[in-house]
């Protein structure tokens, strides 16, 4: 039996207006009925990242290396010895990302993997990726038949999102590994005017916008527990949150994770964004802190703090987090997101609201939220802290 997938129409360009995530049917692929890709890994999605403090310590050593540019933010930005037809200097903007499976369906995992790789380019206000490479590990824990099918489906899903982003996969590397792995490299050659650097423009009074809800890590774990019950599920979740609520949460989260941030990249430039980052493995507060810290270096350093006042979260993820004593730190702002939204700074509430309205109109009706502001950092601020949750911050349940 063939495993048919919905095809995007020619007019679709952003990954939000295609059909909803199809229900995973392993048997239709020739896999055992009980097959789940997440059985072959213990770490999921962007939660596999090295803890942020350890990573930043390593990056400090790397940043001291002569010739390194923009180390530590979402993309590498390297000046080229070429100009465009207008005589403007060109830059190679590149990024790489990969992770272990977070969902059961290998095709969907490929889609999410590609969307996540592209997101770093999009956080630079670059909507057009020139080329992608695919990085893939096939699991040695599967039998040969399962390995062939899952690898094929992951590659198909990755390539489908690349096509939706109007780019192509031109190379990569495939290896064997106990845990499956999917990711890649995204590259674009642009002029200064064609990107929004994450540093240099941010200032006190800027308004912060988030383009996707939070709670994906909670969603994928609840889904796995629904299929493979754990003691925590039995103790804290069963009897409090229904299987139907978990399925709804999972479907909302996977639709969000596979949705491209491409339109957000295009519109942030149009509406005069001062900078952005994407929210992934360190959680929104971790990435906001990194964004704020990046302003304190460079030619015009600023000591700023990003204040998060209201956060959109999947409602069932909020309920589950409260039942589990916030095991994944969603309510603290540190829950890992996979292929999360863009956190964008705008010079005014008017610009931020216009961005949100237009993005909803062109991105399949998906909302964005004004979530906070930028302020001058207190002179007695704790060393290394450049972002905070406002006391009693508002949770917007989605």
Curated annotation (Swiss-Prot):
Gene3D superfamilies: PurM-like C-terminal domain, PurM-like, N-terminal domain
Gene: SPS2
Residues that bind ATP: 49, 72-74, 97, 120, 171-174
Organism: Leishmania major
Keywords: ATP-binding, Kinase, Magnesium, Metal-binding, Nucleotide-binding, Selenium, Transferase
Family statement drawn from the similarity comment of this UniProt entry: Belongs to the selenophosphate synthase 1 family. Class I subfamily.
Protein name per its UniProtKB record: Selenide, water dikinase
Residues given in the record as Mg(2+) binding sites: 74, 120, 278
A GO BP annotation: selenocysteine biosynthetic process
Record keyword Metal-binding present: yes
């Amino acid at each position: 039996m063939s495993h048919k997938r919905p095809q995007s129409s020619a007019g679709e360009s952003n990954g939000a207006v295609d059909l909803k995530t199809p229900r995973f049917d392993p048997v239709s692929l020739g896999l055992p009925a009980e097959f789940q890709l997440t059985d072959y890994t213990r770490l999921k999605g962007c939660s596999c990242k090295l803890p942020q403090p350890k990573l930043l310590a390593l990056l400090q050593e790397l940043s001291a290396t002569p010739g390194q540019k923009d180390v530590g933010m979402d993309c590498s930005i390297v000046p080229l010895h070429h100009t465009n037809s207008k005589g403007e200097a060109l830059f190679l903007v590149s990024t790489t990302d990969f992770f272990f499976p977070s969902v059961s369906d290998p095709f969907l995992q490929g889609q999410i993997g590609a969307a996540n790789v592209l997101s770093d380019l999009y956080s630079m206000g670059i909507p057009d990726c020139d080329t992608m490479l695919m990085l893939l590990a096939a699991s040695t824990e599967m039998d040969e038949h399962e390995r062939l099918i899952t690898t094929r489906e992951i590659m198909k899903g990755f390539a489908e999102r690349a096509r939706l982003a109007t780019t192509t996969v031109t190379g990569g590397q495939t290896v064997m590994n106990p845990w499956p792995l999917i990711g890649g490299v995204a590259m674009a050659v642009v002029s200064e005017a064609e990107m929004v650097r994450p540093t240099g423009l941010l200032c006190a009074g800027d308004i912060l916008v988030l383009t996707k809800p939070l709670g994906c890590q909670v969603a994928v774990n609840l889904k796995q527990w629904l299929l493979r019950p754990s003691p925590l599920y039995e103790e804290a979740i069963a009897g409090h949150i229904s299987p139907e609520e978990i399925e709804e949460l999972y479907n909302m989260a996977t639709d969000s994770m596979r949705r491209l941030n491409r339109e957000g990249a295009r519109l942030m430039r149009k509406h005069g964004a001062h900078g952005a980052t994407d929210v992934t493995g360190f959680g929104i507060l971790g990435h906001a802190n990194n964004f704020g810290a990046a302003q304190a270096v460079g030619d015009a350093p600023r000591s700023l703090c990003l204040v998060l006042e209201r956060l959109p979260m999947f409602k069932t993820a909020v309920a589950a987090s409260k039942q589990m004593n916030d095991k994944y730190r969603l309510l603290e702002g540190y829950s890992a997101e996979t292929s999360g939204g863009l956190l964008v700074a705008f010079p005014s509430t008017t610009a931020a609201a216009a961005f949100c309205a237009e993005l909803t109109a062109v991105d399949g009706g998906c909302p964005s939220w004004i979530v906070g502001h930028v302020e001058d950092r207190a002179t007695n601020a704790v060393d290394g802290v450049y972002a905070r949750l406002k006391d009693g911050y508002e949770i917007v349940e989605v």
